Amino acid sequence: KFGKVLKFLAKTLAKHLAKKQAQS
């Protein structure tokens, strides 16, 4: 179960970083 949460967080973080990169 914890691994699933970690995977979700990683996905969210990646999405957030991608958005930040696109803005720059």
From Swiss-Prot:
Subcellular location: Secreted
GO molecular function, one term: toxin activity
Source species, domain of life: Eukaryota
Assigned GO CC terms: extracellular region
Keywords per UniProt: Secreted, Toxin
Expressing tissues: Expressed by the venom gland.
Predominant subcellular localization, coarse grouping: secreted
Similarity section: Belongs to the cationic peptide 04 (cupiennin) family. 05 subfamily.
Identification of the protein by name: Cupiennin-5a
